[in-house]
């Protein structure tokens, strides 16, 4: 992996997201690009300042632009200072527009995007909306991470027996070639019923034994989000690899109940990839 994007908005500097980027940059060999997006959505501005959208006026817009410019300057300076202190190669991209659209565009030319859970979550679409849209539309894998950094000490790979889940697990394994040898790995096989067997499970296990040294296996019959959360609670500082989910399932995962469980906790980093 050679290029990691870390997404920031004009109001929230996620130090946790940057720390995860350092942690995953494979001994500093990856370029870390800070993408700072000035949200030009009027709805986002109005919500940020507690104003009614329909009373939005030019004076307020000027006030907000000035405040955003100040915060953006502070954030970029902080990012550059931290990267220099760590001796990490970095770039700064300053984008203006709708955050989801800008990051999807940037994702075409990146190996991974890291987003703090609270980044861009001040809009009226609700906490899960931005993250859900990114997970569905991004052109590279996305990691959503807590504000407080904890070193990753285990991996939880989710698997449903379908080719998309194999693709995501393989992509994670190839991106983070050094992690498998160091960390304990749990393969979570998820079925709809206890009687169901998963296609390709034996081949999946065979693949993992080539790449991972310390592997354990769990099976769960039921809803995917319940399986992930239940098993993750038993692991030490896990990174969740949502390899079992394609575009439609990502959308289902971020239903109101499932999203509130994950975002309220905000302590579980997740890696999501799809074709």
Task: For the regions a language model picked out, list residue spans one by one.
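CheY-like receiver
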Residues: 24, 82, 102-106, 227, ...
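Ordered, amphipathic secondary-structure segments that act as subunit-interaction surfaces
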Residues: 71-78, 82-88
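A short acidic, glycine-rich active-site loop
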Residues: 55-73
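Charged docking surfaces used in two-component/phosphorelay signaling
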Residues: 94-101, 220-225
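Small/aliphatic-rich secondary-structure junction motif
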Residues: 1-58, 137, 150-219, 234-237
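Gly/Ser-rich helix-loop-strand patches that form or flank binding pockets
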Residues: 14, 92, 100-149, 232-275
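A short helix-to-beta-strand connector/capping loop
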Residues: 83-91, 211-216
């Amino acid at each position: 992996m050679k290029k990691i994007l870390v997404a920031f908005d004009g109001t929230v500097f996620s130090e946790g997201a940057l720390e995860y980027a350092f942690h995953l940059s494979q001994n500093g060999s990856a370029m870390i690009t800070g993408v700072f997006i000035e949200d030009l959505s009027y709805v986002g501005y109005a919500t940020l300042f507690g104003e009614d959208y329909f009373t939005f006026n030019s004076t307020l817009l000027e006030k907000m632009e000035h405040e955003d410019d100040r915060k953006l300057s502070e954030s970029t300076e902080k990012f550059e200072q931290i990267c220099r202190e760590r001796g990490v190669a970095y770039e700064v991209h300053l984008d203006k527009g709708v955050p989801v659209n800008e990051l999807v565009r940037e994702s075409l030319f990146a190996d991974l995007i890291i987003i703090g859970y609270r980044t861009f979550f001040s809009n009226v679409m609700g906490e899960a909306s931005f993250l859900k849209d990114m997970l569905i539309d991004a052109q590279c894998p996305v990691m959503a991470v807590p504000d407080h950094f904890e070193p990753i000490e285990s991996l939880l790979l989710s698997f449903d027996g379908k080719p998309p889940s194999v693709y995501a697990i393989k992509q994670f394994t190839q991106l983070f070639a050094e992690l498998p040898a160091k960390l304990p790995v749990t393969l979570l096989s998820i079925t709809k019923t206890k009687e169901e067997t998963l296609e390709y499970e034996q081949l999946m296990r065979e693949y993992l034994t080539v790449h991972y040294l310390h592997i354990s296996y769990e099976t769960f019959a039921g809803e995917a989000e319940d399986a992930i959360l239940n098993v993750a609670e038993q692991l030490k500082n896990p990174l969740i690899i949502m390899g079992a989910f394609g575009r439609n399932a990502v959308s289902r995962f971020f239903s109101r109940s499932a999203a509130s469980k994950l975002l309220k906790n905000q302590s579980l980093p997740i890696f999501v990839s799809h074709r």
